[in-house]
């Protein structure tokens, strides 16, 4: 989704809210965690599956109300590769539902490195960064 389309969606919904997807495992309802752990064990895979299922429910509930979501990378990265898969699947699902996605990675580096972070973040998705350091090499 382009920034122009995001602006149109904000006007259409009359809502500029960006919903944060910061799925700390302790925030997730027990029935979701229990189902994920039953299928994958109390492993990184189980935790990541719980994050993904929780996010899908939130996205389903919010997609007609808000124009954008902002998954916080740290809550996914802490679960290793399974967590990164959950982040990628969350982003894919949000985009399927018509939401603009801002990856909250709070990366903090110079412009060329920020370009690499941006390229790494799963295609047509925005990522936040440190504006001062990013401008040093422009």
Q: Residue spans of the language-model regions?
A:
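N-terminal glycine-rich anion-binding loop in soluble enzyme alpha/beta folds
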Residues: 1-61
């Amino acid at each position: 989704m382009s920034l122009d389309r995001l602006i149109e969606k904000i006007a259409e919904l009359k809502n500029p809210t960006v919903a944060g997807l910061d799925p700390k495992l302790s925030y997730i309802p027990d029935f979701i965690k229990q189902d994920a752990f039953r299928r994958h064990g109390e492993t990184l895979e189980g935790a990541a599956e719980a994050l993904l299922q929780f996010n899908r429910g939130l996205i389903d509930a919010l997609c007609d109300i808000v124009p954008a979501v902002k998954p916080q990378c740290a809550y996914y990265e802490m679960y290793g590769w399974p967590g990164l898969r959950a982040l990628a699947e969350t982003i894919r699902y949000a985009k399927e539902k018509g939401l603009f996605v801002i990856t909250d990675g709070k990366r903090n580096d110079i412009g060329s490195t920020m370009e690499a972070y941006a390229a790494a973040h799963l295609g047509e998705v925005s990522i936040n960064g440190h504006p001062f350091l990013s401008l040093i090499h422009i």
